[in-house]
Amino acid sequence: MQTKLSVNINKIATIRNARGGNTPNVELSAIDCERFGAHGITIHPRPDERHITTKDTYDLARVVQTELNIEGYPDQRFMDMVAEIKPAQATLVPDPPHVLTSNAGWDTEKHIVELTKLIAEIKRHGVRTSIFVDTELKNIEFAAKTGVDRIELYTGPYAEHFPINKEEAIAPYVKAAELARELGMEVNAGHDLSLENLAFFKKHIPFLAEVSIGHALISDALYFGLENTVQMYLKELV
């Protein structure tokens, strides 16, 4: 199956915010990513607006023609945005506002009641749901109990161990993904996926629904250009 590429454009907003003004233009970047072949756009509008702002979120909702994936900690601000914008997908991540980047998945057993309520609320708006989790099988099992449509596997540990031992790095992800599929959930993945490790990941999880890639893709675009880079990542997912 064709795994979809959702380009995370947080880093483009980070560059813009470092200088002020509107260069690079976040909306145009999203439109261009789609034009170059991306299947979706991912954003993480944090409360401190360090990269994607609330205004960006609403502006992007008006221009994105593929799938808009809004990820974030499900506080009231986030839930209100999801209810108003109704993106294609909402991905719940457990990081509080002060965390630099998402670095862990949900303890779904501990937060089962809260997550179940949140997932039900989001689904009422016709939005596909996803929960950010690690590969601990218990967290996959309890994610399924929430009624969520998909899980997003946190691939930071995979990327870290890939240069050391590829087979050991991928093994827990294969088990987690297969369990998720058995329990009726589709599987997304994201965090530190790159041109170096993406094809190997897809090869071992061929039913992977979607990857969300930002930091590595935008960094590669500095050298290869955005259009070439999007195409390079798409080829890794064939």
Name each model feature, range by range.
Residues 37-39, 63-65, 84-90, 124, ...:
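Glycine-enriched alpha-helix->loop->beta-strand junction motifs that scaffold or abut catalytic
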Residues 44, 92-99, 150-162, 207-226:
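Glycine-rich phosphate-binding active-site loops on the catalytic face of alpha/beta enzymes
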Residues 50-76, 110-130, 166-189, 195, ...:
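Alpha-helix-loop-beta-strand connector modules within alpha/beta enzyme cores
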Residues 61, 104, 165-166, 220-238:
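C-terminal helical cap(s) of enzyme catalytic domains, especially alpha/beta-barrels
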